[in-house]
């Protein structure tokens, strides 16, 4: 037997690829704390996203983001060998939109294999690659130069600012907006 035959087979690892976009990403450095490469994490870890670097694994440099915006947790469905992700909205101020479903504070759902996650002006295209390992999973971030909604033909959803005003880094559309007769 050769050393090749004796070598342990390496397990593949489940990976969640997240393509991210925000209109102010270049001017404001919103994603500057995020490493745009693959990162291996223990499968027991609850991964939190938000602006508080003491609590969150992935932080956004934006005061409009909640201290903890949302969390992802890996799990295995009963009688299944496939690992899945669960997403939970941790923000009391802003709903999290997964595809077309709105999640309020503490609402959670299974993350589809491919979906769009949005809050405010943030857009995340999340795509899962299955793996065999039960010990670890990986995350990978990719920065998109343009809106993911337009690029992937997702239904539009108007961003809702937390406090009724946009931050300096938010983009404001100069195109006409359709309004109801009773709106001012």
Swiss-Prot record:
Name of a matching Pfam family: FHA
Post-translational modification: Phosphorylated at Thr-9 following detection of ADP-D-glycero-beta-D-manno-heptose (ADP-Heptose) by ALPK1. Phosphorylation at Thr-9 by ALPK1 leads to the formation of an intermolecular binding between the FHA domain and phosphorylated Thr-9, promoting TIFA oligomerization and TIFA-mediated NF-kappa-B activation.
Subcellular location as annotated: Cytoplasm
Phosphothreonine modified-residue sites: 9
Annotated keywords: Cytoplasm, Immunity, Innate immunity, Phosphoprotein
Regions of compositional bias (Polar residues) in chain numbering: 167-177
Superkingdom, natural source: Eukaryota
Any one GO cellular component localisation term in the record: cytoplasm
Main location: cytoplasm
Result of altering residue 50 to E: Loss of homooligomerization and activation of NF-kappa-B and JNK pathways
PROSITE patterns in the cross-refs: FHA_DOMAIN
GO biological process, one term: positive regulation of canonical NF-kappaB signal transduction
Record carries keyword Cytoplasm: yes
Ranges where the FHA domain occurs: 47-103
InterPro entries referenced in this protein's UniProt entry, alphabetically: FHA_dom, SMAD_FHA_dom_sf, TIFA
Region (Disordered): 165-184
Domain notes: The FHA domain recognizes and binds phosphorylated Thr-9, promoting homooligomerization and subsequent activation of NF-kappa-B.
Function: Adapter molecule that plays a key role in the activation of pro-inflammatory NF-kappa-B signaling following detection of bacterial pathogen-associated molecular pattern metabolites (PAMPs). Promotes activation of an innate immune response by inducing the oligomerization and polyubiquitination of TRAF6, which leads to the activation of TAK1 and IKK through a proteasome-independent mechanism.
Subunit field text: Homooligomer; homooligomerizes following phosphorylation at Thr-9. Interacts with IRAK1, TRAF2 and TRAF6. Interacts with TIFAB; binding to TIFAB inhibits TRAF6 activation, possibly by inducing a conformational change in TIFA. Interacts with ZCCHC11; binding to ZCCHC11 suppresses the TRAF6-dependent activation of NF-kappa-B.
Name of the featured protein: TRAF-interacting protein with FHA domain-containing protein A
């Amino acid at each position: 037997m050769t050393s090749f035959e004796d070598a342990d087979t390496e397990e593949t690892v489940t990976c969640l690829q997240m393509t991210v976009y925000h209109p102010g990403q270049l001017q404001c450095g919103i994603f500057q704390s995020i490493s745009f490469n693959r990162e291996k994490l223990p499968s027991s870890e609850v991964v939190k996203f938000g602006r508080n670097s003491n609590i969150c694994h992935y932080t956004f440099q934006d005061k409009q983001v909640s201290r903890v915006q949302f969390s992802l947790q890996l799990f295995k469905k009963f009688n299944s060998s496939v690992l899945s992700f669960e997403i939970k909205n941790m923000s009391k101020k802003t709903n999290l939109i997964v595809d077309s479903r709105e999640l309020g504070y503490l609402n959670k759902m299974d993350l589809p294999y491919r979906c769009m996650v949005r809050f405010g002006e943030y857009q995340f295209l999340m795509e899962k690659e299955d793996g065999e390992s039960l010990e670890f999973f990986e995350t990978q971030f990719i920065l998109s130069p343009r809106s993911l909604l337009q690029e992937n033909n997702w239904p539009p959803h108007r961003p809702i600012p937390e406090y009724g005003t946009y931050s300096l880094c938010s983009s404001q559309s100069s195109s006409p907006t359709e309004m109801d007769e009773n709106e001012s």
